């Protein structure tokens, strides 16, 4: 459960990023494909070269979804419902990949925020990303 302090820390850290969440999403997706090559199976029709336009475009979608979820924390399930349907019913993405991507998002955030990515900020993001992964995985049940 995200506390009021978690919400405050999330919003404050986004304001300190110095880039858009779309850039974080693109960086994180690039890291995912390099670090966890098994995730490439979902992107066989993409140019999977690091930094390719396909990866950047898809990563920007990840960032936009995170931004939308952050703006609608009180209705995160409703906000991500269509995305959850897409991943469960059409793309059939193994839910473990949401956890792997979360790890990569943490690295991207830490890279951009540096000293601002304190233990409390890390915990707030961890709770948020866990919630997002849970919402995206719930249609699999």
UniProtKB/Swiss-Prot annotation:
Entry GO CC: blood microparticle; haptoglobin-hemoglobin complex; hemoglobin complex
Annotated tissue distribution: Red blood cells.
Domain Globin intervals: 1-141
One Pfam family per UniProt: Globin
Molecular function as annotated in GO: haptoglobin binding; heme binding; metal ion binding; organic acid binding; oxygen binding; oxygen carrier activity; peroxidase activity
GO biological process: hydrogen peroxide catabolic process
Residues engaged in binding heme b: 57, 87
Keyword Acetylation on entry: no
Keyword annotations of the record: Heme, Iron, Metal-binding, Oxygen transport, Transport
Role: Involved in oxygen transport from the lung to the various peripheral tissues.
PANTHER family: HEMOGLOBIN FAMILY MEMBER (PTHR11442), HEMOGLOBIN SUBUNIT ALPHA (PTHR11442:SF48)
Record note on quaternary structure: The deoxy-Hb is a heterotetramer of two alpha and two beta chains, but oxygenation results in dissociation to dimers.
Listed name of the protein: Hemoglobin subunit alpha-D
Organism, as annotated: Erythrolamprus miliaris
């Amino acid at each position: 459960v995200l506390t009021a302090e978690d919400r405050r820390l999330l919003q404050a850290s986004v304001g300190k990023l110095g880039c858009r969440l779309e850039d974080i999403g693109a960086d994180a997706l690039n890291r995912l494909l390099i670090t966890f090559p098994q995730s490439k199976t979902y992107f066989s029709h993409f140019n999977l070269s690091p930094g390719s336009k396909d990866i950047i475009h898809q990563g920007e979608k990840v960032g936009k979804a995170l931004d939308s979820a952050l703006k609608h924390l009180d209705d995160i399930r409703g906000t991500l419902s269509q995305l959850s349907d897409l991943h469960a019913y059409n793309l059939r993405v193994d839910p473990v990949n949401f956890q792997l991507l979360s790890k990569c998002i943490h690295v991207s955030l830490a890279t951009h925020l540096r000293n601002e990515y304190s233990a409390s900020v890390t915990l707030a993001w961890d709770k948020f990303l866990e919630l997002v992964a849970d919402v995206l995985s719930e249609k699999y049940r």
